[in-house]
Every structure is written in structure tokens, then in C-alpha cells.
């Protein structure tokens, strides 16, 4: 199942390679998610579209009991697709970056890897970044 085109993947890699700061990756900005973690008490979490892993690291620090794994095809250290399922699949500020042709596949991938819960947060405003072809990153 394809989750992205090779051309778009190269553009995302370029964005990640040319920026030092992550995007929407401050856990304090998503208090509602923290409340869900407290309520659900998951043991495992997949951060789908984790970028360079800043949010992933914050989750690991705040919830040391939680086995956290990141996946992002545009960042080499997180580019291996997970095989296992997770109590929670966390997808923060990612789906607006998915090419429309691949959106159904990405949602199926997320559903397949979730045992119990899925958290989706979609940024609907224009991004501060542009892709190399001039399109807004959102």
C-alpha cells in the first residue's frame, strides 16, 4: 500500500533537511491529548508522521511507562514502517500534508496499526513553509 508519491517524499525530505525547528510539536499545545493519555492509560503509542521526533521525545519523557515508536517516511531514522499494532496511533499536524490520492491509504494504515485509539489533529490554516514546487506545505 503506497502512502505517498516518490516526488512528494523528496519534497518532504527537503523540508525536513532544511529546517532546524520542528513544526507543531509542543506537547503543551495539546492538553486534550494529555487528558486522553491519562484516561486511556495506553501501554504503546505510534507517532505517525513524527518528523524529527521532537514530540516523540516529549511523550517518552512525560510518560516513561509508554512504549513510543515514531514513523515518518521523510526522516531517515524514522522511515521504517512499523509492523506491530499500538494501543494509540497519534497523528498530530500530519494529515494536511498527505497527498489527496494517498489519503485513504494513510487512514487505512493508521487504522490497521491501532488496537484501541486514534488521535488525529489536523491544522487547517496555511503553513509557514512552502514545498520546493511552490505549494503551501498544508
Regions of interest found by a model, annotated:
Residues 72, 93-96:
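Conserved acidic functional residues
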Amino acid at each position: 500500500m503506497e502512502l505517498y508519491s516518490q516526488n512528494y517524499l523528496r519534497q518532504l525530505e527537503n523540508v525536513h533537511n532544511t529546517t532546524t525547528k520542528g513544526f507543531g510539536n509542543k506537547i503543551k499545545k495539546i492538553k486534550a491529548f494529555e487528558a486522553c493519555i491519562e484516561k486511556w492509560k495506553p501501554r504503546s503509542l505510534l507517532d505517525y508522521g513524527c518528523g524529527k521526533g521532537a514530540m516523540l521525545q516529549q511523550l517518552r519523557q512525560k510518560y516513561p511507562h509508554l512504549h513510543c515508536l515514531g514513523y515518518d517516511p521523510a526522516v531517515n531514522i524514522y522511515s521504517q514502517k512499523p509492523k506491530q499494532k499500538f494501543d494509540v496511533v497519534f497523528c498530530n499536524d500530519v494529515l494536511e500534508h498527505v497527498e489527496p490520492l494517498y489519503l485513504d491509504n494513510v487512514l487505512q494504515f493508521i487504522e490497521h496499526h491501532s488496537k484501541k485509539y486514534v488521535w488525529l489533529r489536523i491544522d487547517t490554516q496555511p503553513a509557514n513553509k512552502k514545498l520546493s514546487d511552490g505549494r503551501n506545505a498544508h
